[in-house]
């Protein structure tokens, strides 16, 4: 029997929790009802009650009146005070007092810091005739800074170049977003009632009959604005599980079928499922005939991808592939929860995502309760990466890093700058397609611990990013990346120290400031400080952070003319002329471009959240809610789900789903097996940390003190490794060390290593850099391996060897910072 949600609601003492109030006094504390986001980082934004006394945060509790998380909080959020009060916090702006890497700093004022930045741009870029495109801007995974930092890039620095440098193929989330947009026109998420304000009580909602958890551990990751415990509730309501993952997880232990493909081969299972479902006629005929295009073409194409073919590559038994396909297809309501492996565990992320979207479609698992709902940002508040294009200098916008610069065919369809073009031009100083000079003179990064986090090919990234003449880092903490390469560092506020708002799907949420920390500023305040100095004519529009947030909520940060009317705005939906593009459009002279009914303060006083009716509606395609013209159907050129997406051609992607082997696999390069016998799955998640964050929190480290790599008992015995031994993982790119954790749920030829590790308690100055490079799995990964369309990268199926760490071994930090790394043969656009 499933959880009785009404019984839970009836059990809440609403008077004790001050229903209808957003702040009150309780036992000498001021209590504020709000939502938490970054920093410290999180993919989600759960309702919290913040208890403050004498201006300091004293206690954190979950808010049971919050329908998003129902009062549940993860251990990181409960440990928020340790992060807020961490000795690693950056208190003041500081400029470098010694050489890069020495970790010597001199305190300066915010006015001095802003002037230092503005003067550099004016004297070293503008006065020397260089364009603003020579400024690169980056940020981390803080999910509530996806609109502020791109805006800073365009409006303050007037550059259009924002994104990750060594982030080949945007191998996090972007492949799923784009890969789903092609066939579906929008993004699907598993329906666990999260779009409904009344949640599990909604009379329309039903739990999935079959839940596929694919390359994901949602209870640990809670990724992409999706709480994994919602799926746990679905299981309580009877959902059967299919787990597809080489590593045993909570889901695999409870699954009807646990499929264990070789890393990099999952797409074969998706194609084989399509084969079984089409050949055995298990499709939802009514849905396919009414709402899908190119079914006959898909059926003919996947006839070649039999379960036996998939078994020969994945090593998953053919009978299990076929039987699990039938379990999914025969379910009245089937749902597929996908993870990061779709972006970073394949050489063709777009095709794998396409194949899985096709599975959803031909089984009728779109927009039906308990399947997948198509979602937008609440109230059509879409300011994000493409906001940079609204305000960038027109000449800089023309020289934005794009696909054509690296001879990659097809339209650019991502708002960020092309990562591979960015890295290639940084390395060579020229545009590969033309040979034209393109100097990079400045890098501004906000909440982005790049070397410990997302920068692939870590040694390569350090080598070339260190050559950028002027680097500014803004972050709540002093990080190894900051110490390694920054010239100026700026303190950023934690979530509890800022007023802000963010929409990621639904609901729209507000963060209310309850305390301050020395001279730390919020992202909005930093934008205003930079903008008032560097683009004063524009920034007369905003007097304070609340003005800025209100503009985000009500106009989507659109360009406003002297008459107060909106002139340009972010796209919210495609038109016949705009499919396949990511850009900005004329707004038609309207004064409000979103559907948001709240100002920031009104949202705070409403309890901090607001669900929108659009996301809470099922069968949107039948009601004319998906297309900008108001017609029934889907937001695609044909108006139907395109099982073979026509837009893929425009994007430079072959439109039929296929399997592309990773660069080094047992079936394509068997000679590598002896030298590099293991697949290294990098980036396994933990409850205690969010990417590179929380390593300074004593409680989190008590639960998880060291970086761990899981290894099977048989492989550990073969290499003489005991549980707790430190081992090297190594290939020609480099090596890193982690502590062996023997785990029976591992295949013998697979390792599962953790990412994001550094130790704030270790020496900060180079070569140590808090151990950042010593434990870094990205020492082994490669750049310039993007899949079709420039999307996705197979970094989660890297090959390596292992051996024990010995006293006297050269540490990777020293190898990278003093000895030039492991390779001296890098060539732009070559792995």
Predicted regions and their residues:
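Long, contiguous, secondary-structure-rich segments that constitute the structural scaffold
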Residues: 1-15, 346, 524-596, 600-601, ...
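Flexible, small-/acidic-enriched active-site or ligand-binding loops
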Residues: 376-383, 695-698, 705
């Amino acid at each position: 029997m499933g959880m009785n949600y009404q019984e839970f609601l009836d059990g809440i003492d609403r008077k004790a929790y001050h229903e209808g109030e957003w702040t009150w006094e309780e036992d000498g504390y001021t209590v504020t009802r709000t939502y938490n986001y970054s920093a410290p980082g999180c993919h989600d934004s759960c309702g919290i009650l913040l208890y403050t006394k004498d201006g300091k945060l004293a206690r954190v509790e979950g808010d049971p009146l919050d329908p998003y998380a129902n009062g549940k909080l993860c251990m990181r959020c409960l440990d928020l005070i340790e992060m807020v009060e961490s000795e690693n916090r950056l208190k003041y702006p500081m400029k470098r007092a010694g050489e890069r890497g020495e970790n010597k700093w001199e305190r300066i004022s915010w006015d001095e810091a802003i002037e230092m930045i503005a003067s550099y741009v004016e004297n070293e870029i503008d006065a020397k005739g260089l364009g603003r495109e020579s400024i690169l801007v980056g940020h981390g995974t803080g999910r509530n800074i996806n609109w502020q930092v791109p805006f800073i890039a365009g409006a303050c620095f007037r550059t259009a170049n924002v994104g990750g440098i060594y982030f080949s193929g945007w191998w996090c989330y972007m492949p799923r977003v784009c890969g789903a947009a092609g066939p579906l026109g929008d993004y699907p998420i598993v329906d666990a009632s999260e779009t409904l304000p009344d949640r599990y009580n909604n009379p329309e909602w039903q739990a999935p009959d079959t839940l596929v958890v694919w390359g994901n551990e949602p209870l640990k990751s809670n990724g992409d604005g999706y709480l994994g415990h919602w799926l746990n509730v679905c299981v309580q309501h009877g959902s059967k599980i299919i787990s597809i993952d080489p590593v045993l997880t909570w889901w695999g232990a409870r699954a009807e079928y646990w499929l264990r493909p070789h890393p990099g081969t999952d797409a074969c299972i998706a194609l084989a499922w399509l084969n079984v479902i089409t050949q055995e006629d298990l499709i939802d005929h009514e849905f396919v005939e009414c709402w899908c295009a190119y079914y006959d073409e898909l059926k003919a194409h996947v006839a070649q991808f039999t379960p036996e073919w998939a078994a020969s590559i994945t090593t998953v038994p053919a009978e299990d592939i076929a039987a699990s396909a039938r379990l999914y297809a025969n379910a009245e309501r089937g749902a597929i929860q996908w993870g990061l492996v779709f972006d970073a565990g394949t050489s063709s992320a777009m095709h794998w995502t396409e194949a899985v979207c096709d599975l959803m479609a031909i089984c009728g698992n779109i927009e039906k309760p308990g399947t997948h709902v198509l979602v937008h940002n609440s109230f059509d508040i879409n300011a994000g990466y493409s906001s940079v294009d609204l305000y960038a200098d027109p000449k800089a916008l023309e020289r934005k890093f794009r696909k054509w610069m690296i001879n990659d065919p097809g339209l650019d369809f991502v708002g960020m700058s092309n990562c591979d073009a960015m890295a290639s031009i940084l390395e060579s100083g020229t545009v590969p397609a033309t040979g034209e000079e393109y100097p990079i003179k400045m890098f501004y990064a906000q909440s982005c611990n790049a070397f410990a986090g997302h920068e692939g090919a870590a040694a390569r990234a350090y080598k070339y990013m260190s050559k950028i003449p002027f680097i500014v880092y803004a972050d709540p903490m002093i990080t190894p990346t900051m110490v390694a390469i920054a010239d100026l560092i700026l303190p950023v506020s934690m979530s509890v120290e800022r007023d802000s708002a963010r929409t990621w799907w639904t609901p729209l949420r507000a963060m209310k400031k309850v305390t301050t920390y020395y001279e730390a500023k919020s992202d909005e305040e930093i934008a205003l400080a930079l903008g008032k100095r560097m683009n004063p004519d524009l920034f007369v529009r905003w007097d304070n952070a609340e003005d800025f947030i209100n503009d985000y909520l009500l106009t989507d940060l659109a360009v406003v003319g002297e008459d107060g009317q909106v002139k340009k705005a972010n796209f919210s939906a495609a038109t016949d002329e705009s499919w396949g593009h990511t850009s900005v459009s004329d707004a038609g002279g309207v004064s409000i471009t979103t559907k948001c009914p709240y100002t920031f303060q009104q949202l705070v006083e409403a309890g901090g959240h607001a669900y929108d009716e659009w996301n809470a509606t099922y069968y949107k395609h039948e009601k004319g809610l998906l297309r900008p013209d108001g017609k029934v159907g889907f937001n695609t050129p044909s108006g139907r789900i395109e099982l073979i997406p026509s837009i893929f051609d425009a994007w430079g992607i072959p439109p039929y789903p296929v399997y592309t082997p990773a660069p080094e696999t047992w079936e394509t390069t068997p000679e590598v097996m002896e030298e590099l016998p293991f697949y290294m799955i990098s980036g396994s998640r933990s409850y205690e940390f969010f990417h590179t964050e929380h390593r300074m929190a004593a409680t989190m480290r008590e639960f998880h003190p060291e970086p761990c790599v899981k290894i099977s008992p048989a492989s550990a015995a073969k290499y003489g490794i005991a549980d707790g031994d430190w081992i090297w993982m190594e290939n020609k790119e480099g090596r890193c060390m982690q502590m062996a954790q023997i785990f029976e749920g591992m295949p013998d030829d697979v390792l599962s290593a953790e990412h994001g590790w550094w130790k704030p308690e270790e020496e900060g100055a180079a070569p140590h850099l808090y151990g950042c490079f010593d434990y870094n799995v990205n020492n082994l990964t490669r750049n310039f391996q993007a899949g079709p369309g420039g999307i996705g990268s197979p970094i989660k199926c890297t090959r390596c060897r292992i051996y024990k760490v010995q006293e006297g071994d050269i540490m990777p930090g020293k190898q990278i910072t003093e000895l030039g790394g492991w390779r001296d043969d890098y060539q732009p656009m070559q792995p």
